[in-house]
Amino acid sequence: MTEQKHEEYGADSIQVLEGLEAVPKRPGMYIGDTQDGSGLHHMVFEVLDNAIDEALAGHCDKITVTIHADHSVSVADNGRGMPTGIHPKEGRSAAEVIMTVLHAGGKFDNNSYKISGGLHGVGVSVVNALSDWVTLTIYRDGKEHFVRFVRGETEEPLKIVGDSDKKGTTVRFLAGTETFGNIEYSFDILAKRIRELSFLNNGVDIELTDERDGKHESFALSGGVAGFVQYMNRKKTPLHEKIFYAFGEKDGMSVECAMQWNDSYQESVQCFTNNIPQRDGGTHLTALRQVMTRTINSYIEANEVAKKAKVETAGDDMREGLTCVLSVKLPDPKFSSQTKDKLVSGEIGPVVNEVINQALTDFLEENPNEAKIITGKIVDAARARQAARKAREITRRKGLMDGLGLPGKLADCQEKDPALSELYLVEGNSAGGSAMQGRDRKFQAILPLKGKILNVEKARFEKMLASQEVATLITALGAGIGKEEFNPEKLRYHRIIIMTDADVDGAHIRTLLLTFFYRQMPDLVERGYIYIAQPPLYKAKYGKQERYLKDELEKDQWLLGLALEKAKIVSDGRTIEGAELADTAKQFLLAKTVIEQESRFVDELVLRAMLHASPIDLTSSENADKAVAELSGLLDEKEAALERIEGHEGHQFIKITRKLHGNVMVSYIEPKFLNSKAYQTLTQTAAALKGLVGEGAKLYKGENEYDADSFETALDILMSVAQKGMSIQRYKGLGEMNPEQLWETTMDPTVRRLLKVRIEDRIADEVFVTLMGDEVEPRRAFIENNALIAQNIDA
């Protein structure tokens, strides 16, 4: 780590450049996409980066990130605390200036922070501008300071609210619903970024807590970038055990790099500048690739490796199967945009070159076994590249890849403008025939795919080109294939729609196609050209009514609508009907879904009892005993036994023991379950049902009358009556639909539903490797961990 001098970090360190007015008008310039979730998570990362900068400066070793139940997020560190003194030019506290003025921060003069990732006042002020509210708590100079902001404006000046021996800053914010289409945070996306930061910053303990469901993870990962590479390769097969590692400093800049090759065919390189990831690389990555190629080629020539193998190696060959983490730290880094996806600082290139060249030369000379394995992998890649080039030449001579000859099975459209054209990739000739007859020939092209295409995750490039179905697909798309040939500007369709059956084979074919696009044509995914069709799962008839229903949920909702027609409940002289009946029924069905999902963790009988019980309180042994008594009273003692137990640090739990088919089943009600959205749904439902329907209640459906002593009984009767008059057909294959049905449900742009495929890079890479790679154990573990929560699986 670059040495940090402990200069004064006070109010006069803060420089002011401009205000916040522009941010809400153009949020994408500062935070990224506000609709797809990336900008929302970037809000957290901006605040988190400031805490990490305190760690880089040597003042912080503990950071806590919390997703609160109200969808706000807080980031707390034990650093120096934001300056609280009065800013000499602004006439108000420096903390308020940092939070309300764009480009106000302590990172412009290189004194308060020599190395920083974010500009503490660019990021955090943008977060303030795009939030409904922000609270800032500062522990500094023996005092606790507090200030609250509403939509970027100070509600009242910073004030001292008490004495404290703590140090640090806590920022809590609620993202603005006007700016962001959705403020649901993903625990996994935040955990991914925090894991990166933990590897990159040894000695910093970062904790992530989700109050919505009680999930918690602690990150105190060691090993630096080498440990990071080992983690990235955990689901792959490394070719050599020893990981290459390099570290060096020059002119106030540092370079740290780790590399390890595996048996896959994909390159996986993560680049960071002052802990900030660069998705699009930049000058540090360019320098790394150049020095790698030059250094390894020198070793190969000196040892006549390529000469003996009779091949010529290139830079791409050296990066096949490479997993690498490159982390650079430098003062005043320059990026191509505020989102910092690409580094443009030219001064880092020579430092990367010098550090990597010397370290890699030494590594290859001092570790002959590793060098032999790595160069052997490179030679194999060079042979495969040459074979692929020959395969391309053969296919080009046949007219396959230059657009002169289109596949015979492609039913092309009349439209020549790619932006107005769409290609349906359809499973099987039967469905392909229906799609051809049902389509709009003007702009819809159809390509039937026979059987399952090749799994490109396991296949070399030349083998992929030899696959007839893959070659047909490449030809139809018209954009070529491979780094030398692929040109997305030549793509013939800007909507590529995958349309497969709603069964296991259909899901497999869809996954194979997505693997192909992700690995071979990622540009098409990033540009938003790949879609998944959503054909209906059901066709339902009720009297003269006929409906296509997308999935199980839509079927249940339609059935509920039919069940509630001309229905009412009369209990204790009160009539429940119309909107009140519908809202309560929807709430109850939601609770049933929650019970079904949560029964993996908590006994189902007890979950059902919660719908008739008071909210559970486990804050003390007395309250826990009350909850045990109430729940036990709602259950038959032969069904389940409940008891209070005390856990670590006095935490209260309820243990549930139940005998089922001769087996003893044990589950627990834990404090974290009571903080979950699932339990909130159950308590809301219990409140809605309380006193609603009692003994002697009557249910009326049209002219019929039924006895119903509970709301659940009434709803069961209504759903049963509705189902009697309904006939449901489940579509397993697209071929079961005639052309007219396929058009009106799945292909008509005015009514169809399409899912646009978007990918979060690092998570996607891991999932594809797990599901489509060679290793059986990670795939088995993934299936076992997710089988119970998977939906729409056909037996």
UniProtKB/Swiss-Prot annotation:
Marked site positions, Interaction with DNA: K452, N455
Subunit-structure text: Heterotetramer, composed of two GyrA and two GyrB chains. In the heterotetramer, GyrA contains the active site tyrosine that forms a transient covalent intermediate with DNA, while GyrB binds cofactors and catalyzes ATP hydrolysis.
Keyword Cytoplasm tagged: yes
Reactions accelerated catalytically: ATP-dependent breakage, passage and rejoining of double-stranded DNA
Cofactor requirements of the protein: Mg(2+); Mn(2+); Ca(2+)
SUPFAM superfamilies: ATPase domain of HSP90 chaperone/DNA topoisomerase II/histidine kinase, Ribosomal protein S5 domain 2-like, Type II DNA topoisomerase
Gene: gyrB
The protein's name in its UniProt record: Antibiotic resistant DNA gyrase subunit B
InterPro entries listed in its UniProt record: DNA_gyrase_B_C (IPR002288), GyrB (IPR011557), GyrB_hook (IPR049353), GyrB_insert (IPR041423), HATPase_C_sf (IPR036890), Ribosomal_Su5_D2-typ_SF (IPR020568), Ribsml_uS5_D2-typ_fold_subgr (IPR014721), Topo_IIA (IPR001241)
Classification via Gene3D superfamilies: 3.30.230.10, 3.40.50.670, Histidine kinase-like ATPase, C-terminal domain (3.30.565.10)
Species whose genome carries this gene: Neisseria gonorrhoeae
